[in-house]
């Protein structure tokens, strides 16, 4: 199984990339994690709809066919660590590759959000995009550790 994190925005601070890389290398070989950063559409005088369309096209191009799409959305389902671990286990049992989508500064195209297989949220807080990448991969690693009985997660 592969977890694909698709994030709108190509540039993150070094600290965020270092933290992301640290968690990414902890995953076992049977659960590969890949990050695909797609370009943020330059704002200029474009409408939000134009921005959404351009970014959606890039996101869709980054996702292989047949991949389960899970978007991070402030209106998505709020999950506990245990619930995320159960979701991860379900995806693994189904053999699905999963793409977790982090939108750009203006969010995601509403139709794309609605078409996703699932919508989840990481927090009630507004977080910087670089922090979301780190928080997401850490929580995915934590979910894996719960399922694997690894001592990383403690009750």
Curated annotation (Swiss-Prot):
The keyword S-adenosyl-L-methionine applies. It catalyses: pseudouridine(1915) in 23S rRNA + S-adenosyl-L-methionine = N(3)-methylpseudouridine(1915) in 23S rRNA + S-adenosyl-L-homocysteine + H(+). One of its GO terms (cellular component) is cytoplasm. Its EC number is 2.1.1.177. It comes from the Bacteria. Disulfide bonds: none annotated. InterPro entries: Alpha/beta_knot_MTases (IPR029028), RlmH-like (IPR003742), tRNA_m1G_MTases_N (IPR029026). S-adenosyl-L-methionine binds at residues 72, 103, 122-127. Keywords: Cytoplasm, Methyltransferase, rRNA processing, S-adenosyl-L-methionine, Transferase. Its main location: cytoplasm. The keyword rRNA-binding does not apply. Pfam families: SPOUT_MTase. One of its GO terms (molecular function) is rRNA (pseudouridine-N3-)-methyltransferase activity. It is found in: Cytoplasm. Belongs to the RNA methyltransferase RlmH family. Specifically methylates the pseudouridine at position 1915 (m3Psi1915) in 23S rRNA. Homodimer. This is Ribosomal RNA large subunit methyltransferase H. It comes from Delftia acidovorans (strain DSM 14801 / SPH-1).
